[in-house]
Amino acid sequence: MAHDHNHDHEHEERELITLVDEQGNETLFEILLTIDGMEEFGKNYVLLVPANAEEDENGEVEIQAYSFTENEDGTEGDLQPIPEDAEEEWNMIEEVFNSFMEE
């Protein structure tokens, strides 16, 4: 799922992931961006958008952010919500996302 993201290339294929909620409902998401936060926070991050999301009246789409840990073979992993009070983590994610969007 994860890859080094050096922000100097375009994705030709969409990377998709299926999330399952507490009720067992599956939702398909597109991986918008992965962020290597191992050095600073000891974990990596992923930004997701619903795969078939349409922009709202303001031209925006809901983006979800999670920290993640891959399993040893790199095919799956565990997503964890990022605590709302993790201000330094959110600041880093916002900074990387803004740089990504400027490209």
Curated annotation (Swiss-Prot):
InterPro entries reported in the protein's UniProt record: UPF0473
Pfam family, one: DUF1292
Superkingdom of origin: Bacteria
Recorded coiled-coil stretches: none
Transmembrane segments: none
Family affiliation: Belongs to the UPF0473 family.
Alphabetized HAMAP family for the sequence: UPF0473
Name of the featured protein: UPF0473 protein SGO_2040
The species this protein was found in: Streptococcus gordonii (strain Challis / ATCC 35105 / BCRC 15272 / CH1 / DL1 / V288)
